[in-house]
A protein has these predicted regions:
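Beta-loop motif signature
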Residues: 37, 190, 197-226, 231
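Membrane-embedded alpha-helical segments of integral membrane proteins
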Residues: 111-152
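Internal/C-terminal transmembrane anchor helices
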Residues: 160-183
Length: 254
């Protein structure tokens, strides 16, 4: 009985110690930021990574983690986490600015293919708002439609009926139009998978094996589009249209 009592006491002490040492993500974030401000960048990276290990993520977390990697000249890691920050919040201006500096450390100079006039106009128009805003606009249109209908129904004067009827039509057209834009925007984002090259130098082959012809090589930090997978190989496409196969271990999907 006494032995069991000691075991229980030791177990409770260990459990209590774990509870005392346990830290919330907010506390870890604060400590990581303090480490970063003290120029202890590797320590900050470990602490920010600890928050990710807890299953927490945010645009600010990825942004700070990218900054710490940038300070240590970790090209691939900094670009990867800036991209992650922008994926969660495309309007993160700090990440938009800093990723440009990080990309200047890359070796590969890739000239994107020119867009067609129609594609350029559509991309420019869609980029006016984020996906979240486009998703809200159809709901707002329905609300305006309902309110206009009620005002139209209870109005006595003809001029007011005409005004509210016009608003009804505009709200209906706007709601339907923005719904399809939001749906197109969402599917476009979901259909595109990107990755960042992490190896110092990666050979890209014409076929998903190392026996085929080596077409070109890529270096750390280069962003590629993921097209397909086969075993431990991944088919990638560059912004300039080049296509090839690289090993999955050489890149990290966003």
């Amino acid at each position: 009985m006494r032995t069991n009592r000691y075991i229980i006491i030791v177990f409770l002490m260990v459990l209590w110690g774990q509870l005392v040492l346990a830290q919330t993500p907010e506390e870890l974030f604060k400590q990581a930021t303090e480490s970063y401000n003290a120029a202890q960048y590797q320590k900050a990276i470990d602490q920010y990574q600890g928050i990710l290990d807890l299953g927490q993520e945010s645009s600010a977390l990825y942004y700070n983690l990218a900054n710490a990697h940038y300070k240590l000249n970790n090209v691939a890691e900094s670009i990867y986490y800036y991209e992650k920050a922008l994926k969660l919040n495309p309007d993160n201006e700090d990440a938009q600015n800093n990723i440009v500096f990080a990309q200047q450390m890359t070796v590969d100079a890739i000239t994107p293919l020119p867009k067609t006039w129609l594609r350029g106009v559509s991309d420019c128009f869609i980029s006016i708002f984020s996906l979240q805003v486009w998703s809200i606009l159809p709901i707002l249109g329905v609300f305006v439609f309902v309110m206009s209908f009620l005002l139209y129904y209870f109005s006595q004067k003809t001029i007011f009926k005409r005004i509210f009827f016009t608003l009804m039509l505009l709200a209906l057209i706007g709601s339907i139009g923005t719904y399809f834009i939001a749906d197109f925007h969402k599917k476009s984002i979901e259909s595109q998978r990107y990755a960042i090259m992490f190896d110092k130098a990666t050979p890209v082959f014409a076929e998903p094996n190392a026996y085929g012809a080596e077409m070109f090589s890529l270096h750390e930090g280069t962003k590629v589009e993921v097209i397909d997978y086969l075993n431990d190989w991944v088919k990638i496409r560059l912004a300039d249209g080049k296509i090839g196969w690289a090993r999955q271990t050489t890149l990290r999907v966003l």
